[in-house]
Amino acid sequence: MSSRRMNRFIFIVAGCCSVLTGCMKWDYDLGREIAVRPEVGHGLFITNEGNFQYGNATLSFYDTQTRKIDNEVFFRANDQKLGDVAQSMTMYGGLGWIVVNNSHVIFAIDPVTFKEVGRITNLTSPRYIHFLSDEKAYVTQIWDNRIFIVNPKRFEITGYIDCPGMTMETGSTEQMVQYGKYVYVNCWSYQNRLLKIDTETDKVVDELVVGIQPTSLVMDKYDKMWTITDGGYEGSPYGHEAPSLYRIDAATFRIEKQLNSNFGNGPGGGRH
């Protein structure tokens, strides 16, 4: 089954993110029988991020036909905890790819059995994965001024994209969308930019300044990108402003519309 069809059939709900770093040990235990066995087209994966540094992230599965939910399916299928801060999950190539931020790992699982089929390790603090092909994907990071290039087939890191204007301490790249050969990414923590990456050269070729801390990035069916800023927080060394919503044309990489909000009305209430 193609990745596009798989994306239509199985959807994912992700919890909000933690932005600190740390480490944890892989923990194994006896699993329990899993009642729900998903059929393609009848399910919803839910990543539960857990508490930072508690290593209690979990994966749930909701069957949309029976309206039954099974919790901790990764743990029960693999006799292993998912890790510390489940940041996001993406379907591609018939597999579910779970990005576990504070465990520095991405798990690939069979979406029917929930069994692990591979993992990408030695990541700094991964946030999201975007697939360019069966053998190439980008992984965004926080506390790193690079986007990692990985080979999903071999579960290996193959290279890096240097992001301008960042250090390892201030590095922050988040969600990615693609238009033609270009991938766009929002830079969130202590940042105010979107980056444009040429996927043929793996280089940043342009950037666009928006408001303080753009938290997310999506593309609509009209090839318009949308990003919303949280405006930072009071007392932040990077500044504090009211949140805004931006519409950006993907072809020209220019802001077409800016909708300003009030303090306290942005993502997370506009403050941290």
Regions from the language model: what does each represent?
Residues 9-17:
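Sec-dependent N-terminal signal peptides
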Residues 19-22:
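C-terminal motif of bacterial Sec signal peptides marking the signal peptidase cleavage site
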